[in-house]
Amino acid sequence: MAMATRAIRYQLPSPRFRAPRCESSEPIKQIQIQQRPRGGDLAENGKIVLQPRLCTLRSYGSDMVIAKKDGGDGGGGGSDVELASPFFETLTDYIESSKKSQDFETISGRLAMIVFAVTVTEEIVTGNSLFKKLDVEGLSEAIGAGLAAMGCAAMFAWLTISRNRVGRIFTVSCNSFIDSLVDQIVDGLFYDTKPSDWSDDL
């Protein structure tokens, strides 16, 4: 029994098609990637990148530029100056003038205490009372001197207090005063007291 012979043909797979490389004369540009510094590098460089945060009312109000009494903005620039609330500006002037008046009242009170102490000391040492020698004419002179001192104190207070600016307190509407008061209360209760207290978690 004869067996038929078969020719076995092997065909190698054709290589994949490769796109021709286009060689250009232009140099290849190198891109430099800056790496973000780690926690150790931050301490050496001394630069800390803070995370974005929401601005509170107190921190926003701290950046407000307040005009001085002489018309300057304090920054040396000629741009428009954003004025603060007229109520708080008037209140500040009133507090300053009250401090000046309080100093005068303190000095006057101390002088009166010194005079009274000298009178009592003289009466104890010499035994002579100054009040027994006073008659109607002396009482009238003492009352006149007291009224003169009161008039001088009133004149001094009148000159130190800015009458026009203090009068603005009564012209401020009730709604604006309540709004500013509520704003200060809410800001003090629910927001940070100092922007410097913020700490960045590295």
Swiss-Prot record:
It is a multi-pass membrane protein. Induction: Present at low levels under low light conditions, but accumulates under high-intensity light. Induced by UV-A illumination. Fades out upon wounding. It comes from the Eukaryota. One of its GO terms (molecular function) is chlorophyll binding. Residues 1-60 form a transit peptide. GO terms for cellular component: chloroplast thylakoid membrane; photosystem II. One of its GO terms (biological process) is cellular response to high light intensity. Keywords: Chloroplast, Membrane, Photosynthesis, Photosystem II, Plastid, Thylakoid, Transit peptide, Transmembrane, Transmembrane helix. InterPro entries: SEP2. It is found in: Plastid, Chloroplast thylakoid membrane. The chain crosses the membrane at residues 111-131, 142-162. Belongs to the ELIP/psbS family. May be involved in non-photochemical quenching, a process that maintains the balance between dissipation and utilization of light energy to minimize generation of oxidizing molecules, thereby protecting the plant against photo-oxidative damage. May play a photoprotective role in the thylakoid membrane in response to light stress. PANTHER family: STRESS ENHANCED PROTEIN 2, CHLOROPLASTIC. This is Stress enhanced protein 2, chloroplastic. The lineage of its organism: Eukaryota, Viridiplantae, Streptophyta, Embryophyta, Tracheophyta. The gene is SEP2.
